[in-house]
């Protein structure tokens, strides 16, 4: 497009105006926790959310056009424009293209809204009667998961939306999903 009205298109990269679409800084973020208890069981949940910002796929500059033809490309390149009349938002691949046509493209800009199950713990504490006979204090078995579920609200987003202050992904390693098992015994 030539400007923010999106009323005209151009093939001349220099003829397009730069437009501010949003901010990398979330408008809202926070977390909420809850614990549910029933008899000896406890379920602890912590959710974290971030809303109202955009994230940019910096690596997409290299992975979508033909700038670096020998490097790995995104699977979405299979949806690229290939013949007249085809409708797609992935441009034609030009082998050896050197103009960084994707550098400041909105194709690489995504809504960064997400909610993540940051921590979930399911535990069971043995009854006190059993423990007193064994001479033990509180004994709890648990299984804990970290970052097991992330819901994003932009269907095109293929990377972890939780990233640094610039909200730019550059092949960053996503936050690990971790599951631990444990036993806590008080003597």
Short names for language-model regions:
Residues 38-41, 136-138, 176-178:
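Strand-connecting loop/turn motifs
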Residues 50-140, 145, 158:
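Extracytoplasmic gating/loop element in the C-terminal half of outer-membrane beta-barrel translocons
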Residues 45, 141-143, 183:
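Membrane-embedded beta-strand positions of outer-membrane beta-barrel proteins
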Residues 1-46, 89-131:
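Outer-membrane beta-barrel transmembrane strand signature
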Residues 1-11, 64-76, 159-169:
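Surface-exposed loop/turn segments flanking beta-strands in extracellular/periplasmic regions
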Residues 73, 78-85, 100-102, 150-187:
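C-terminal beta-signal and terminal closure region of outer-membrane beta-barrel proteins
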Residues 37, 48-50, 144-148, 186:
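Outer-membrane beta-barrel pore domains and translocons
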């Amino acid at each position: 497009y030539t400007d923010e009205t999106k009323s005209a298109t151009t093939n001349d990269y220099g003829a397009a105006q730069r437009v501010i679409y949003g901010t990398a800084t979330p408008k809202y973020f926070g977390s909420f926790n809850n614990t549910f208890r029933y008899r000896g069981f406890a379920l602890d949940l912590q959710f974290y959310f971030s809303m109202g910002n955009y994230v940019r796929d910096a690596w997409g500059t290299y992975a979508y056009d033909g700038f670096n033809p020998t490097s790995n490309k995104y699977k979405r390149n299979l949806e690229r424009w290939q013949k007249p009349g085809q409708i797609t938002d992935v441009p034609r691949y030009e082998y050896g293209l050197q103009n960084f046509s994707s550098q400041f493209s909105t194709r690489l800009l995504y809504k960064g809204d997400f909610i993540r199950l940051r921590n979930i713990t399911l535990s069971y504490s043995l009854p006190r009667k059993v423990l007193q006979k064994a001479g033990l204090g509180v004994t709890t078995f648990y299984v804990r998961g970290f970052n097991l579920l992330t819901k994003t609200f932009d269907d095109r987003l293929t990377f972890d939306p939780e990233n640094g202050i610039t909200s730019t992904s550059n092949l960053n390693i996503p936050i690990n999903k971790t599951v631990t098992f444990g036993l806590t015994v008080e003597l």
